[in-house]
Structure formats: C-alpha cells, structure tokens
Amino acid sequence: MTPSRLPEPRKIGRRPVLAALLGAGLWGRAGLARAIGDSSRIRLARLQLPDLPDPRPTALRRLAWELERRTSLVAVPDPISLAPASPELFRHPLVLLSGDRGFSLPTDAEVARLRRFLTFGGCLLVDSAEGRAGGAFDASVRKLLAHVLPGDVPARVPDEHVLWKSFYILHSVPGRLLAAPYLEGVERDRRLAVIYTQNDLCGALARDGYGRWEHDVVPGGEEQREQAFRFAVNVVMYALCLDYKTEQAHIDFIMRTRRTRPGFP
C-alpha cells in the first residue's frame, strides 16, 4: 500500500527546539545548529540493538569524510554506536537505525527514552538494507515506531518538503537500489522526527579500507551513488538546521554556489 502524504511542512526554527533541550538538561552540544559558513563539529551515530548487527559498518565513516569535503561541517571520522538507554543519545541530533533483518523491540524504558529523544528535537534516520520493500526489517521498524510514537504513522514525504533542498536540490531518494520510489517520515511539532528509506542508502555509501566501493549501485551506477551521497548530506543538514533553506537568503546562497562551485548540482 502506498503511504499517505505528510501535510506540507510549516516553518519552525531549530533554536526553540534546542532551547527546550538545553533547558531540560538533555542536549549537551550547543552550537550544532548553525547557518552555512560556520563550522560545527559533529559525530555520526548509529542506534545499536542487541539482535540487529550493522549491515554497513563503513558507511557512516565515509559519510563523515564526505561531509567535510562538501560542507562547512567538521566531522569526527569515527562514528559511535549507542544503545537506546545511553545518555549519550541526547548529544546527537541525528541517529541512524539500519538493518537487514527483523529485530526485537527494546524494553519499555528504552522505548520511553527514544520517545523523549524524538519529542525533544532528535531525528532518527531509518535505512533498510534488506534489498526489497516490505520485508522483516520494515515490519519491525513499523512496530517499533508504533510503540515509540503511538498514533503517528509513517507517511510519504511530499516533493515540496524542505528536506529536498536543505543543501542540494534533489528530487528522489536513491540508495544502493530503488526498492521504494518514495521517502517516508513521521512528523512531530511540524518537523521530521523520523526519516525512513527502504533503498539501502548506506549500501551506496559503504567503502572498504582499500578505497573500493563495497556494493554495486543499481540501476543507475555511479550517478545514483552520487545522488545517494547528496541525499545523505541533505539529511544531516536538515537534522542540524531544520528548514533554514526556506529563507530566501539561503536560496540565494544555493544559486550563487551553483554558479561558482564546480560539481555543485
């Protein structure tokens, strides 16, 4: 069944969200949400569940490298794996949940902590590496989200959403393959708290220690891989800055950069 569409997003600033987190003593890294031109040191994180091994362990390290190459962000090269109960969870605006199989639900206490993380400004990027839509991982993800965010059902992210222009201007959600032609999300307080792709995004990013891509990208080859990297960059920038690209000043920045920076889309 094709998911319903999210309502068109309305403008919300990142600062009120971070202020609420800081006031609650939850967010330990002020200054992450900054406009283009400033540097922010970030560390990418993956949510670690006991029965869900990382199917693409080199992907986040490669993404960290690409973030430094493509943006003004300064990224810690080594990602971190975090259990749902870890207090470090609240130091990371964006956390990845990836898998290629079904998994068990976390404990009630861990579910409550994830709910708090997503409610107070955190973003969960979910990436299926199953190679098809609607598999065991997908079923487990939907069950998890139903417990973490009861009443909020994943819905299709509309083409007009600011996520598609948070850094690069994009029109699709590529990965190692194209299992699902749409992106899903869950909104909280008019922002995407969950971003869900079934196209094995991390499979397109993974690169071994010898500099070789670990997986072929089909059907679009290296152009599709490049689009996957651009989408991953957009997700990171969205999680850090939310919808600042709706401001005309940033639209102007994109257009100037496209004219002056080789290889920019």
Regions found by a protein language model. Give the residues of each.
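Alpha-helical scaffolding within the catalytic cores
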Residues: 79-84, 107-113, 179-181
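N-terminal secretory signal peptides and thylakoid transit peptides that target proteins
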Residues: 3-25
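Aromatic-Pro/Gly-enriched surface loop or interdomain linker
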Residues: 29-94, 101, 201-202, 209, ...
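An acidic, glycine-rich "communication" segment
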Residues: 131-229, 233, 258-262
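Short alpha-beta junction capping motif
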Residues: 94-138
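Charged, often glycine-rich, active-site loop that binds/positions anionic groups
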Residues: 91-99, 166-173
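Active-site-proximal beta-strand/loop segments in catalytic clefts of secreted hydrolases
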Residues: 47-50, 97-100, 127-130, 158-159, ...
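Extracytoplasmic/secreted envelope proteins and their assembly/folding machinery
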Residues: 57-64, 111, 115, 138, ...
